[in-house]
Amino acid sequence: MDPNCSCVAGESCTCAGSCKCKQCRCASCKKSCCSCCPVGCAKCAQGCVCKGASDKCSCCA
């Protein structure tokens, strides 16, 4: 289970506008949740929902 949402890690779940899920995919927005990424990070823009500061982005590292 993801401690921040009611889903099993890696499974789909429904997320609100402010996505707190870290280990699951959000069915409602069809994207994985991650920190907000710096400008120019195409990978993050395509598959993530912002949930944190850009300097803590992990999906574009």
UniProtKB/Swiss-Prot annotation:
Residues 30-61 are annotated as: Alpha. Gene3D superfamilies: Metallothionein Isoform II. Residues 1-29 are annotated as: Beta. Pfam families: Metallothio (PF00131). It comes from the Eukaryota. A divalent metal cation 6 binds at C37, C41, C44, C60. GO terms for cellular component: cytoplasm; nucleus. The keyword Flavoprotein does not apply. A divalent metal cation 4 binds at C33, C34, C44, C48. A divalent metal cation 3 binds at C15, C19, C24, C29. One of its GO terms (biological process) is negative regulation of growth. A divalent metal cation 7 binds at C50, C57, C59, C60. GO terms for molecular function: metal ion binding; zinc ion binding. Keywords: Metal-binding, Metal-thiolate cluster. A divalent metal cation 5 binds at C34, C36, C37, C50. A divalent metal cation 2 binds at C7, C13, C15, C26. A divalent metal cation 1 binds at C5, C7, C21, C24. InterPro entries: Metalthion_dom_sf (IPR017854), Metalthion_dom_sf_vert (IPR023587), Metalthion_vert (IPR000006), Metalthion_vert_metal_BS (IPR018064). PANTHER family: METALLOTHIONEIN (PTHR23299), METALLOTHIONEIN-1B (PTHR23299:SF59). Metallothioneins have a high content of cysteine residues that bind various heavy metals; these proteins are transcriptionally regulated by both heavy metals and glucocorticoids. Class I metallothioneins contain 2 metal-binding domains: four divalent ions are chelated within cluster A of the alpha domain and are coordinated via cysteinyl thiolate bridges to 11 cysteine ligands. Cluster B, the corresponding region within the beta domain, can ligate three divalent ions to 9 cysteines. Belongs to the metallothionein superfamily. Type 1 family. This is Metallothionein-1B. It comes from Equus caballus.
